[in-house]
Amino acid sequence: MSKPLRIIFAGTPDFAARHLSALIDSHHEVIGVYTQPDRPAGRGKKLTASPVKELALEHNIPVFQPENFKSDEAKQELVDQNADLMVVVAYGLLLPQAVLDTPKLGCINVHGSILPRWRGAAPIQRSIWAGDAETGVTIMQMDIGLDTGDMLKIATLPIEATDTSASMYDKLAELGPVALVDCLSDIADGSAIAQKQDDELANYAKKLSKEEAKIDWTMDAIAIERCVRAFNPWPMSHFSVEDKAIKVWQSRVESYTGDATPGTIIQADKTGIYVATGSDAIVFEQLQVPGKKAMGVQDILNSRKEWFEVGNTLN
């Protein structure tokens, strides 16, 4: 077994907490945890600790929550810990070069894509929307660029036809910690091999917006169905009926060669609500109307049949 590393962990959401849990269970020593400051959450806007902070406190690991690393105090706090390595997973703060240079072995990051494809904030969602056959995690040595560092380990898995961003998030949250612990063993014993990224193959996974999630009926049905899966659980693909926003939870593609205007309902029964698109038809199987939970199409038609009459146009 390789020599234990003195590790600082930096992360914030549940995805990061699962990686921290794997480090705690490994033979390495987590000497400190950095996470975003407590934020207001819930209806009462009560200050709430991040999942990473909660896990660290459960294991009596010191927690640090700077707003940024601009102050000399924050930088010195990091220096004083004398870490071998910093592991960064969905931290949410930009790390200046001075921070990247502080640990003896620098900083590594777990990124939710097969780099250099899908650098940026929303790699899981963009990979589904693009119709990629696979995705994975890349563990890279961090540099000052946006997900541009040398790659140390890549682990992949297929994107299934029914995968949503929610399901892929869970799968990568299982894949990532295993790859991370393996990578740490390689770093500790000196066998890790850094591979440079090919910048010509890179593309950018920009943050999602609610505007993108509004269905464009002129797109082909395959693209719309991918959007439905990519935007689940947020911001949710949606369309409008009588100024009511309807969220789409589940859909499928059916062949259609008619000439109905995109956005027109061409069939509505217990098998689904069929809507013409730029190519073929998108069939809605599960929808959510305002103020209600997601419902199967039969329940929707029983309660809102007038909204989904054949010939109606959706916005």
From Swiss-Prot:
GO terms assigned for molecular function: methionyl-tRNA formyltransferase activity
Catalysed reactions listed for this entry: L-methionyl-tRNA(fMet) + (6R)-10-formyltetrahydrofolate = N-formyl-L-methionyl-tRNA(fMet) + (6S)-5,6,7,8-tetrahydrofolate + H(+)
EC number: 2.1.2.9
Keywords: Protein biosynthesis, Transferase
GO CC, one annotated term: cytosol
Positions of (6S)-5,6,7,8-tetrahydrofolate binding: 113-116
UniProt keyword Repressor, yes or no: no
Domain of life: Bacteria
Family classification: Belongs to the Fmt family.
HAMAP family: Formyl_trans
Function according to Swiss-Prot or TrEMBL: Attaches a formyl group to the free amino group of methionyl-tRNA(fMet). The formyl group appears to play a dual role in the initiator identity of N-formylmethionyl-tRNA by promoting its recognition by IF2 and preventing the misappropriation of this tRNA by the elongation apparatus.
Protein name: Methionyl-tRNA formyltransferase
Species for this entry: Aliivibrio fischeri (strain ATCC 700601 / ES114)
Lineage: Bacteria, Pseudomonadati, Pseudomonadota, Gammaproteobacteria, Vibrionales
